[in-house]
Amino acid sequence: MILIIYAHPYPHHSHANKRMLEQAGTLENVEIRSLYHLYPDFNIDVAAEQEALSRASLIVWQHPMQWYSVPPLLKLWMDKVLTHGWAYGHGGTALHGKHLLWAVTTGGGENHFAIGSHPGFDVLSQPLQATALYCGLKWLPPFAMHCTFICDDDTLQAQARQYKQRLLAWQEVNHG
């Protein structure tokens, strides 16, 4: 099962993430958990989140990039849900062998994230990749949708279909 942990503080403003979720939602065995919908008060149900993670083979962290990082509720979710003795540390093997995909949208162009005056995309992904590896997850190459503020609808739809194809390809390889 694919579990999408979706974190967008203003989901009604995001045409890109909306289209990505619509495309992903057409696949079988996909569960979408919208953190800002489930936890508007930031009071995360750790047991429910850990149960959802336990059912998944592929975990997707989908969100807009905010200040070169994750939105605050996703960071809190990581702090609360990925606990010692469950996700890492002595006895913390619940996530071992599962895959993790970082699916991120950005307002800037892909060239904005080239090494130079701004941090490169590989550099920006390092904290998430390190978290994944620490928890025994298999890190997959990220999926990024760039220029989402200026893309026309056809471009957003095409990129959202690429996202769906990426998930479908994972399903075909891993679950035949």
From Swiss-Prot:
Swiss-Prot/TrEMBL keywords: Cell inner membrane, Cell membrane, Flavoprotein, FMN, Membrane, NAD, Oxidoreductase
Membrane topology value: Peripheral membrane protein
UniProt superkingdom: Bacteria
Cell compartment(s), UniProt: Cell inner membrane
Keyword Nucleotide-binding: no
One cellular component term from this protein's GO annotations in UniProt: plasma membrane
GO terms, biological process: positive regulation of potassium ion transmembrane transport; potassium ion transport
HAMAP family on file: K_H_efflux_KefF
Subunit and partners: Homodimer. Interacts with KefC.
Protein name as it appears in the record: Glutathione-regulated potassium-efflux system ancillary protein KefF
Source species of the chain: Salmonella heidelberg (strain SL476)
Classification of source organism: Bacteria, Pseudomonadati, Pseudomonadota, Gammaproteobacteria, Enterobacterales
Gene: kefF
